[in-house]
Design a protein with these regions (language model features):
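Active-site-proximal beta-alpha core segment in soluble small-molecule metabolic enzymes
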Residues: 1-107, 113-114
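A structural signal for short, hydrophobic beta-strand segments that form beta-sheets
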Residues: 14, 102, 198, 240-248
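Generic structural signal for well-ordered, non-membrane alpha-helical segments
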Residues: 43, 47, 87, 118, ...
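Active-site loop/helix belt of alpha/beta enzymes
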Residues: 69-186
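Active-site loop ensemble at the mouth of alpha/beta enzyme cores that anchors a bound cofactor
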Residues: 153-232
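C-terminal accessory subdomain/extension
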Residues: 205-321
Length: 321
């Protein structure tokens, strides 16, 4: 819901809700008021809540059923959904609810990155999705097939061949899927960075501010590096080895080891490039425009949930305009 609020506060249409995280009971009415195109449910209980909220809002909500079958892959703590073998009964139950209509099926992940060969491969889930969709079509339904996971234009052909009608671009929009880290000829270019500065030094290392130092663990451990710009001067920038606290710890700071002959000082700008997860951090989000034209400009500073961050320097620059 925090992400949905951010989308709506920006004036955008809400395409899909409840897919990764279900809508809490007490927020169902707010969710219905946002009029999402699709709303995913993991259970009949959640379907009933969504339907009732939609009915109170005077509309009929298209629901996607998350389905599963033996052999499917889930991230730990993200299991759930309807048994694909019972998808027809589940769809009938949903269609019987005032305020709801079964619009199709979804899963996650439909594709996963394979570190061994550097490709995005179909999971067993994608086959489950295809089978469930076929069963629904055979019953005379028009079916939407939502198939997210490692989504970028490089995966569209695979997903289309499996019958997908919807994808969730996610990191495809910022060019930060695992494929983009190892392939330099994809249409999308990496367009996200974590920018911070040096706080202090200790024991021969420099400590830069954390808050957004969560690296999505899609690769085996590797030596992280960061670009250090002395005093913000990128013409003099250099790479430094970095150590980031593990996910089990709070990322108060990242640690930088100066290369031989270099010094890292308080206030130096530090830039990391990794697969970010803004919603899972306390870092701010700053969209930049004008990069291709050579006139980059920060459009504002927002918290990860979409609220204006009222960052002092940006507020002062806006006031001077």
């Amino acid at each position: 819901m925090p992400c949905a609020r951010a989308v709506r506060s920006a004036g955008l249409r809400l395409g899909h809700l409840g897919h990764l995280v279900q809508v809490p009971t007490r927020e169902a009415d707010e969710a219905a008021s946002m009029q999402p195109d699709f709303w995913t449910v993991f259970s009949q209980d959640k379907a009933a809540q969504a339907a009732a909220a939609a009915a109170r809002a005077g509309r009929v909500q298209d629901l996607l059923l998350r389905v599963h079958a033996p052999g499917d892959t889930f991230y730990l703590g993200h299991e759930g959904g309807f048994d694909a073998a019972d998808v027809l009964a589940a769809a009938d139950d949903v269609d019987s609810l005032p305020g709801a209509r079964c619009a199709g099926v979804t899963t996650f992940p439909a594709l996963l990155f394979s570190a061994s060969d550097g490709t995005a491969q179909a999971t067993h889930n994608l086959g489950t999705l295809h089978t469930a969709a076929d069963a629904l079509r055979a019953s005379g339904r028009q079916v939407q097939v939502n198939a997210p996971g490692t989504t970028s234009s490089a995966a569209f052909a695979t997903l289309a061949a499996a019958g997908a009608t919807q994808v969730e671009p996610g990191h495809g929009l910022t060019g930060t899927t695992p494929l983009h880290a190892i392939t330099d000829d994809l249409p999308e270019l990496p367009a996200a960075a974590y920018v911070t500065e040096v706080s202090h030094s200790y024991g021969g290392r420099a400590y830069c501010f954390g808050g957004g130092l969560y690296i999505d663990p899609v690769f085996p451990d590797y030596q992280v590096q960061a670009l250090v710009a002395p005093g913000g001067d990128f013409d003099a920038a250099f790479l430094a080895d970095a150590e980031i606290p593990p996910p089990s710890m709070i990322d108060y700071y990242g640690m930088l080891t100066p290369p031989d002959g270099r010094q890292i000082r308080t206030g130096d700008t530090v830039v990391f490039g990794f697969r970010i997860q803004a919603f899972g951090t306390r870092g701010n989000v700053v969209p930049i425009t004008g990069v291709q034209g050579g006139r980059p400009q920060a459009l504002g500073v927002w918290a990860s949930d979409g609220r204006p961050a009222n960052w002092p320097e940006h507020a002062e620059s806006q006031a001077r305009r």
